[in-house]
Amino acid sequence: MSDNILSRIRADAGVAVAELIPAAHLTAGQILVVGCSSSEMVGGRIGKCSSPDAAAALIDTLLPPLQAAGILLAAQCCEHLNRALIVERACAEHYGLEPVWVKPQPHAGGSFATAVWERFADPVAVECIRAHAGMDIGQTLIGMHLRRVAVPVRLSVSRIGEAPVVFARTRPP
């Protein structure tokens, strides 16, 4: 994998998170769900070219500004783990989420969820969540993890690396 694609992932993700926080009206203690196909980010087909390096580049870019703003990250696993989510234990406890007994791996859970697990201080997997906003990288289908009502958010970024990306915020019904 070229350094060029990793640099693009970092640059695209940096712009995306900087724009999404204010555009989605995210505040400390709220949850951002991120679904990510590392395969799509590097130009492959979802589920076929898992890239731990691309996943690491993404999480290492997203996590610092989210933590600085007090926004809680929920990383969606792939379908092999029934789209469970990786969160910090404190997030699960605060929102009353019951942990499930799984640990993601690059080919069972996904490279992104694995990278998040490795970087969190006290990670747990939960079955479902109702996030305040979302970032879907590579058409991973995060809608099931958003609160009602989801509203599209348009940012200047339409791709993270080679993957299409869409963003959402939520509002009360």
Predicted regions and their residues:
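Structural motif
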Residues: L32-G35, V166
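Glycine-rich beta-strand-to-loop/alpha-helix junction loops that act as flexible
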Residues: V34-S39, Q76
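Generic secondary-structure signature for well-ordered alpha-helical cores
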Residues: A18, P22-H25, L63-I71, W117-A125, ...
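N-terminal glycine-/serine-/threonine-rich phosphate-binding loop
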Residues: M1-L32, P52-P65
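Glycine-rich, aromatic-bearing surface loops/beta-hairpins
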Residues: T114, E118-P173
